[in-house]
A protein has these predicted regions:
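Short acidic-glycine motifs
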Residues: 1-494
Length: 494
């Protein structure tokens, strides 16, 4: 068994992975009241985790699987939600923890440097209630669990251009870096001269600053902190933000006994979640301070199950079920407008001409300002953002059991259907859906030398990237996968 996997936005249920019998963690098939509870895109996880107080029992089979327990190599797990009874029963729970109840971060034990622990408030609360609607006939059970988490994300230290640098002034910087003019010298870069503006060396004239870079500089302005000094070196900015995680899980189950021979049940489960991971540089984007997906990540998971039994004779029993599970998860950031096209005026980043173009291509491109000594990202650098998963699962089946003496015979049929409908253009570690631009300092340095961070910033201001790229989703992947089976087995007593 492993800890919670994947990001909060990709796994808001905080499902864990389990290896059984030495098999892959993808070999565990989990159901809730017979309804498939798989996560098609991340099959080591489950789609929905009901509140602990809502669970009546968990049946785990790890070997000698029955014919009806397919799609499992390690374990077949069936979780049963509680049912109402002839008596009203209810429970309530509240759990809380904060930074005062937890240990210090292993890397923040120096009280002089870190006088206080990062704020971390977690609250989980809920309850259950069940009872009769019509005694001996109709019963109900409901439960709810809310999770609220707010924590200080960061601090995260970066090197940011100063206000003077963003205006083109690269004088009086640590190490006295020289910014070379790419408009001078030959095609191989030999013969470059130090850049100047009106005779002032290491100055970029305002009319040479790229329009997109100037617009990004305005977004960066509120984040620019202190000047570079010998004491702090390149790390002149420390940012943090308040990350949040909100989740509401609930189940409703109805049981109906129309006559002594029959029983019918139905359940509806849902989980609505919202994850927020603040960008390091506010409106200018940057890396996520909590290490996940930038911005908001809403999610909605729903599960519906119907089932029942019918006793024809004391020896002959029919059981059946139907289930539907839907996942709708997404992670988005700055999608309100095509900023790359409208604000920065960079063609091809958003809008018309984008294959399968839609609002999910909106937002700021990624600007990576890198050097051997430091790096910083502007815009939206996350190569997996945005994403939208809309996955459906259907399952239906029926079994007929016959018993006589020490012998039993059971047969059945099941149909299982899975649909994937995803949007997530991915381009490795560089390309994003909105376009990516890398500035590594080579443009404003001499060939054969090691560019400094300040050369990289100068490249950015001049609008001369060393590398560009963009991730396109040429077609929207849509997968349908179905399984059906018919099985019988007999058991004879000794």
């Amino acid at each position: 068994m492993t800890a919670e996997t994947n990001s909060l936005s990709g796994n808001p249920q905080r499902a864990i992975n389990t290896n059984v019998n030495g098999q892959s963690n993808q070999g565990v098939n989990t159901r809730i009241d017979g309804t498939q509870d798989a996560y098609p895109w991340l099959p080591a996880n489950v789609a929905y985790v009901p509140p602990a107080d809502a669970i009546q029992e968990v049946n785990v089979v790890t070997n000698s699987f029955d014919a009806e327990q397919g799609l499992a190599g390690g374990a077949a797990v069936n979780v049963q939600i509680k049912s109402g009874t002839n008596q009203f029963h209810g429970t309530g729970v509240w759990f809380t923890t904060n930074q005062d109840l937890t240990a210090r971060n292993y890397f923040q034990t120096d009280i002089k440097l870190f006088p206080t622990k990062n704020s971390n408030h977690q609250n989980q609360f809920g309850g259950t209630f069940g009872g009769p609607i019509v005694k001996n006939k109709l019963f109900f059970f409901v439960d709810y669990e809310g999770t609220l988490q707010r924590n200080l994300a960061g601090p995260d230290t970066r090197s940011l251009p100063t206000a003077a640098m963003l205006s083109g002034d690269f004088r009086n910087l640590p190490g006295n870096p020289i910014i070379y003019d790419p408009a001078t010298g030959n095609a191989t870069g030999q013969g470059k001269q130090q850049i100047s503006c009106n005779g002032v060396l290491n100055m970029i004239c305002p009319n040479r600053i790229d329009y997109a870079s100037a617009q990004m500089s305005q977004l960066l302005a509120p984040s620019v902190a202190q000047e570079f000094t010998t004491a702090n070196g390149l790390n002149n900015f420390s940012g943090s933000g308040t990350a949040s995680f909100t989740r509401n899980n609930a189940d409703i189950k109805i049981n109906y006994l129309p006559n002594p021979r029959a029983m019918i049940f139905g359940h509806y489960s849902f989980s609505k979640s919202l994850v927020f991971d603040p960008p390091l540089l506010g409106n200018a984007g940057g890396d996520a301070t909590n290490g996940g997906q930038l911005g908001d990540a809403p999610g909605m998971i729903q599960s519906v199950g119907l089932g029942g039994t019918y006793t024809f004779t004391p020896n002959l029993l029919l059981d059946w079920n139907f289930g539907f599970t839907r996942q709708n998860l997404s992670a988005t950031f700055d999608l309100g407008s095509p900023d790359g096209l409208d604000l920065l005026k960079i063609p091809g980043t958003n809008g018309a001409g984008v294959p399968n173009g839609n609002d999910l291509y909106n937002g700021l491109p990624a600007f990576q300002v890198n050097s051997a000594s430091s790096s910083v990202n502007f815009g939206n650098p996350n190569t997996g953002n945005p994403f939208q998963f809309r996955d459906n699962q259907y399952v239906t089946g029926a079994n007929l059991s016959w018993n006589r003496g020490k012998h039993s015979l059971r047969g059945g049929i099941e149909w299982n259907h899975t649909q994937l409908n995803h949007f997530q253009p991915q381009g490795g570690t560089f390309q994003t859906a909105r376009g990516s631009f890398l500035f590594n300092g080579n443009v404003t340095s001499l060939p054969g030398t090691t560019p400094t961070y300040f050369n990289s910033v100068a490249d950015f201001l001049l609008g001369l990237p060393n590398q560009t790229g963009k991730a396109y989703q040429v077609f929207n992947p849509s997968l349908c996968d179905g399984h059906s089976g018919l099985g019988t087995f007999a058991i004879s007593g000794r």
